[in-house]
């Protein structure tokens, strides 16, 4: 599917829109604006899953004692996966991030 997209066919707009997918709440911009582009849509779905994970991590702060630990580890995971997603966009690849892509495929 996405692997069939060649590097030379991706323009600057596509790269910027795909990169926005991994910047927190800005993941909604590519989902709403550039839904027809398969490369952007792939990254937008993964970015949406990462954003939802971050929002759920905030709710973990309400759990006594363990909430701070859960939030800390989840925040690190969100940061790492967002950076990996941005790197894959810069290299113009469609890397399936572990667990994130599994959830994104079911959206």
Curated annotation (Swiss-Prot):
Going by the UniProt record, its keywords in alphabetical order are: Biomineralization, Magnetosome, Membrane, Transmembrane, Transmembrane helix
Residues exposed to the Lumenal side: 35-46, 91-107
* Signal sequence segment: none
Describe the outcome of a gene knockout: Intermediate magnetic response, slightly smaller magnetosomes. Double mamF-mmsF and double mms6-mmsF deletions have a normal magnetic response, slightly smaller, fewer magnetosomes. Deletion of the 4 gene operon (mms6, mmsF, mms36 and mms48) gives an intermediate magnetic response with fewer, smaller magnetosomes in irregular pseudo-chains.
Q: Which GO terms describe its cellular component?
A: magnetosome membrane
Explain what induces or represses this protein's expression. Answer: Part of the probable mms6 operon.
- Residues on the membrane's Cytoplasmic side span 1-13, 68-69
Miscellaneous notes for this chain?
This bacteria makes up to 60 cubo-octahedral magnetosomes of about 45 nm in diameter which contain membrane-bound crystals of magnetite (Fe(3)O(4)).
**Protein name in the entry:** Magnetosome protein MmsF
